[in-house]
């Protein structure tokens, strides 16, 4: 069983190139890839995820998902999820999404007294926070959360 959680926050002219390959060769293997993040300014991100079910990977499961929040119209997000399969009895899922902040969500948070900038920070942090909370070491989780807050 392999689970990969990847979070990113890109700003200015940062570029992220995320490439993942999960090869399933044994019976009842499991993999799960989650990438999520936010881009602002002119940041760019590309995600290439491949789930490869080889012969012999009977009853295996694999999933990959990429979610990107586009904070500016000048950012670029490319997602290329790929499923390869040489075995019959497997379950493979892939998904990719990119979009702007939901204006209703933004309005709701702002109606509670937060500025637009603060509301956007809350939304971005709430998106990244579940990955941070799964780290399992409180000291590292606090450092990661501080880094996220400094970045946004």
Specify the residue positions occupied by each region the protein language model found:
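Conserved beta-strand/loop scaffold segments within soluble protein domains that form the structured core
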Residues: 1-114, 135, 140-152
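Extended amphipathic alpha-helical segments enriched in small hydrophobics
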Residues: 106-114, 118-130
């Amino acid at each position: 069983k392999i689970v990969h959680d990847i979070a990113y926050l890109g700003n200015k002219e940062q570029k992220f190139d995320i490439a993942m390959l999960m090869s399933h060769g044994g019976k009842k293997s499991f993999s799960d890839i989650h990438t999520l993040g936010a881009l602002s300014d002119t940041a760019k991100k590309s995600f290439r995820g491949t789930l490869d079910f080889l012969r012999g990977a009977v009853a295996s499961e694999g999933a990959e998902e990429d979610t990107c929040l586009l904070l500016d119209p000048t950012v670029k997000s490319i997602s290329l999820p790929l499923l390869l399969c040489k075995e019959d009895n497997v379950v493979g899922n892939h998904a990719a999404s990119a979009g702007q902040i939901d204006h209703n969500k933004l309005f709701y948070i702002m109606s509670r007294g937060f500025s637009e900038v603060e509301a956007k920070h809350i939304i971005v942090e709430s998106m990244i926070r579940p990955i941070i909370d799964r780290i399992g070491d409180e000291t590292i989780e606090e450092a990661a959360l501080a880094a996220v807050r400094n970045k946004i």
